[in-house]
């Protein structure tokens, strides 16, 4: 079953977020989660397995700036998607993406975008399996001033 993330399931959401983004502190994750819950331009969904435990999540945001490879605005942007290892290959990501797409359409979007690190081949395979088409490969640069 797919449910929207809310104040009643924060602990499970935090656990899944921490598994996907382990470098973030619990305090940082909680602050971002509060921002998502307070924003009309963001939402998050979780998947609950047959045993009642939450096993996967997806976060999505509306982006009004340019999104690489997209032709419309706003664009629904998949900020993160994760399935616990014990629940992989059971279709949870596909069910989450279906819910994300429905939300995006309700927000007036005609495109769903995402990104991943160029070295993250597992994520690239997942995106392809979920129906995403690669649009660009970009290298970012930085120069410190001072």
Swiss-Prot record:
Chain residues that bind substrate: 21, 66, 79, 115, 136
Superkingdom field: Bacteria
Cysteine pairings via disulfide bonds: none
Boundaries of every N-acetyltransferase domain copy: 1-146
Catalytic reactions of this protein: kanamycin B + acetyl-CoA = N(6')-acetylkanamycin B + CoA + H(+)
Pfam family, one: Acetyltransf_1
Alphabetical list of InterPro entries matching this protein: Acyl_CoA_acyltransferase (IPR016181), Aminoglycoside_N6-AcTrfrase (IPR024170), Bact_Acetyltransf (IPR050832), GNAT_dom (IPR000182)
Record EC number: 2.3.1.82
Name of the top EC class for this enzyme: transferase
Residues reported in the UniProt entry to bind acetyl-CoA: 120
Record's keyword terms, sorted: Acyltransferase, Antibiotic resistance, Transferase
Self-association and partners: Homodimer.
Protein name stated in the entry: Aminoglycoside N(6')-acetyltransferase type 1
